């Protein structure tokens, strides 16, 4: 033991932790009960970790008490203690786990927490529930001894800018033989949490299904267990109520919302395993964090192994719950999990069952399915791109905003096909509102064709592959040639409007090509425009313009030159034919056709200053200036 180890060290919190603590110390949240749920959950995790490590090193458990959690109120001292005899922490682990938040997205999380009405739910989702204790305590002392170690450490903070860490006193060291003890010095307005009935109420509401016994140690009387400590997923569905499932979901997911879908079953056969999975009804703030993985916990015969086993594909990462295997070896390493043949089969079977359950929910309970789709539809669509085996099912599950203004399934869209329509049409962009006014819709709108309006970033990816639904190809209105001539227009009088073009096709295209030079790959007469002058489209063989835009923003490829389509019936295009080839007016009008198409596509002209000067020049000419 060195002198420096013996001394009391004061260390600052990580900046984001200080900000988080400030929110907790000055909390305006009313649901302060969460602190006990979070501390009990952390204690349970510590017991899980010890049980897992003891598979390889049985001596860590020793001959002592069974793994458990104790809650000890002390009205005389005004303290509430939550203690476990789990894995415990060394000095550096106390610093790392309680002084920093070692994961990406921390700044975004703290910012979101400031804005969120359900901030407490975010705390549990992000895995920083320990800090919620500062809502009710003005001082916290943590005493911990790691399993198999002799040193005992004490961590103390009042929720300010830092914390103290030192060797524990002899008295504390004698009391904490293994695990962690958290002593909360409660604020005056939080003394209700010293009442045994309050503690029992909170444990019953949030922690009843914790797998380890939770003992309440009153100041008078004998300790007693206050939770059922049963693996709810191992029980029969007939024994469980909707309220049981709700409590289990909220405990497993550290959530406050109700589950929108519950899947509970037992698989028997070649492999035996129990499954209890939930789909939340609200979206977690970090759903699209690159580091976010699935949150399904793997157990083997009720022993927690890991929550990092990738039990479901990435597009189902919003699902929470438990898979408990009867056949996997208890001592399976986390490294072996990825390629274990049993687990490969379990992953495949569980993913198929989840998708099947979503299909059933979509048919039988449209309201709850809508909650799932609104929160997680963008994630589910990743599966259309990633999971060829289930692509057709995921397409059937998908709900798309269309030009009808409603969210519709592809089955509904196909059922309402117009005469002679053979393809499902779509447009990809960055917002529904901008897509609604996109000029590429004009020919389809004139025929009453329903078009999918796709505005999630993932839409640019899954639509980049040849895709069809029930034999009907999906066709982009912004890529390749378009021929809608066989589909009659809604208003027959519209047919008369396309009789005489304002411009001679070959001559006009040649003039515009000459004016634009290398800015575009080609100039074509448009079959998709009825009232706008021009639009940009991508070649049928390459990536869409939307995918190009996303990839270029990530520095992942050059953008191809677009095809400029012109409306030969538009007066502006007709004016180009009438003007003298090579004149300034022809150059200005041709460039303006390109630049306004870029603007309508959500892009800036290549040279905004030149565009403004050109526009001013043409306006003044029109005014006779």
Curated annotation (Swiss-Prot):
Main localisation: cytoplasm
Subcellular location as annotated: Cytoplasm
Classification via InterPro entries: HATPase_C_sf, HSP90_C, Hsp90_fam, Hsp90_N, Ribosomal_Su5_D2-typ_SF
Region (A): 1-334
GO BP terms, alphabetized: DNA damage response; protein folding; response to heat
Key words, A-Z: ATP-binding, Chaperone, Cytoplasm, Nucleotide-binding, Stress response
Record keyword Secreted present: no
SMART domains: HATPase_c
Region (C): 550-625
Region span, B: 335-549
A Pfam family reported for this protein in Swiss-Prot or TrEMBL: HSP90
GO CC field: cytosol
Protein name as it appears in the record: Chaperone protein HtpG
Membrane-crossing residue ranges in chain numbering: none
Subunit note: Homodimer.
PANTHER family in the record: HEAT SHOCK PROTEIN 90 FAMILY MEMBER (PTHR11528)
Similarity remark: Belongs to the heat shock protein 90 family.
Role: Molecular chaperone. Has ATPase activity.
Keyword Nucleotide-binding: yes
Stored SUPFAM superfamilies: ATPase domain of HSP90 chaperone/DNA topoisomerase II/histidine kinase, HSP90 C-terminal domain, Ribosomal protein S5 domain 2-like
An example Gene Ontology molecular-function term: ATP-dependent protein folding chaperone
Ranges in a coiled coil: none
